[in-house]
């Protein structure tokens, strides 16, 4: 306000809202979102209905994320608005307060794993400053290679896989035969698998869930030294958020499926020969990553039910501090159902005893 000559005041010009950076409290708000998504999907484990489980997780995450203090825009979600009524790309999420953020979510990474009761299904999300995440819309797949912090400086996606394996083994003080490479089990990877086997390295084939595989490659004592191969671009960006927090490295190149997708990418200005680094995929200093296990896996334990409640295990990371937290939580479903808008019981007639 400014003073007039008669001592009265009049409003001054409006001031712009200062950009607000995501703070550390956001991490705990976000992990509640993936916990809820995992608990909702946990009721569908092994039931052979991946759409039902994914839908339950989507509904729950959307309900919870709109209580989080942020002004988020979905950069990676369930698809375009016409095909995804919730968590579609471009949707605004959060409660309207707090920092402006890019929001990436995969309610269930590994829907087939969940539906079959197989290991390594997780509920996962990432948050970064607005404009920090690479736009994945032009090309659905990318070729990627991932390693942990100790080998980040020797990674070269343009080199043969054998050279990468030998370089990583050298800096990790391993023999090539000690190395384990994680690869999605797909027909397109037949040559890659042959090339890795020719080096003498071991292979860990996974049917789905390459976000968890990429994180395992960055974690000591995980038993995985590298992830390689073609996988989803959205999953690559979400994995890059985790890798930013862990100090590892991912390199990627867009991999169009056909001439139509290639032309679409070129028309949109993408350089298909460009090597995308971790920072190209997710830039900025404020990157958050959260994941909660749905089924037991190498990265996280799945949702486990007991009389009166369930337990979840989550991993929460923040790039600014470099902190990685493992969170074990016990949820009293009998208490949650007293106030939550979400039905975590999966049975309207259930009467859980108190634990």
From Swiss-Prot:
Is Transcription given among the entry's keywords? Answer: no
Tell me a GO biological process for this protein.
fructose 1,6-bisphosphate metabolic process
Q: Which cofactor does it need?
A: Mn(2+)
Tell me its EC number(s), please.
3.1.3.11
Which reaction does this enzyme catalyse, per its entry?
beta-D-fructose 1,6-bisphosphate + H2O = beta-D-fructose 6-phosphate + phosphate
- The record's principal subcellular location, in a coarse class, is cytoplasm
Q: Which domain of life is it from?
A: Bacteria
Disordered: annotated span: 1-25
Q: Which family does the UniProt entry place this protein in?
A: Belongs to the FBPase class 2 family.
Name of the protein in its database record? Fructose-1,6-bisphosphatase class 2
Q: Which organism is it from?
A: Mycobacterium leprae (strain TN)
């Amino acid at each position: 306000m400014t003073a007039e000559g008669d001592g009265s005041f009049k409003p001054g010009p409006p001031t712009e809202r200062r950009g607000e950076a995501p703070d550390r409290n956001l991490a705990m708000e976000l992990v509640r979102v993936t916990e809820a998504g995992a608990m909702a999907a946990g009721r569908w484990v092994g039931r052979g209905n991946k759409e039902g489980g994914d839908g339950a997780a989507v509904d729950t995450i959307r309900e919870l994320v709109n209580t989080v203090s942020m002004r988020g825009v979905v950069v990676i979600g369930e698809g375009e608005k016409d095909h995804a009524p919730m968590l579609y790309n471009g949707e605004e999420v959060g409660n309207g307060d707090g920092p402006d953020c890019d929001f990436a979510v995969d309610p269930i990474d590994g829907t087939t794993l969940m539906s079959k009761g197989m290991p390594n299904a997780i509920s996962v999300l990432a948050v970064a400053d607005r404009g920090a995440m690479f736009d994945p819309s032009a090309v659905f797949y990318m070729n990627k290679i991932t390693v942990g912090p100790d080998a980040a400086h020797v990674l070269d996606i343009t080199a043969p896989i054998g050279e990468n394996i030998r370089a990583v083994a050298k800096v990790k003080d391993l023999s090539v035969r000690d190395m384990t490479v994680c690869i999605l089990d797909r027909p397109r990877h037949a040559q890659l698998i042959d090339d890795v086997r020719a080096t003498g390295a071991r292979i860990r084939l996974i049917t789905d869930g390459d976000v968890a595989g990429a994180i395992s490659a960055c974690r000591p004592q995980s038993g995985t030294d590298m992830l390689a191969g073609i996988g989803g671009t959205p999953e690559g960006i979400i994995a890059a958020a985790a890798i930013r927090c862990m100090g590892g490295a991912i390199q990627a190149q867009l991999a169009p499926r056909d001439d139509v997708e290639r032309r679409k990418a070129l028309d949109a200005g993408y350089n298909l020969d460009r090597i995308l680094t971790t920072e190209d995929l997710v830039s900025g200093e404020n990157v958050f990553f959260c994941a909660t296990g749905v089924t037991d896996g190498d990265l996280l334990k799945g949702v486990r039910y007991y009389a009166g409640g369930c337990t979840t295990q989550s991993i929460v990371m923040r790039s600014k501090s470099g902190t990685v937290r493992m969170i074990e939580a016990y949820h009293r479903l009998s208490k949650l159902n007293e106030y939550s808008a979400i039905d975590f019981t999966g049975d309207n007639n259930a009467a859980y005893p108190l634990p």
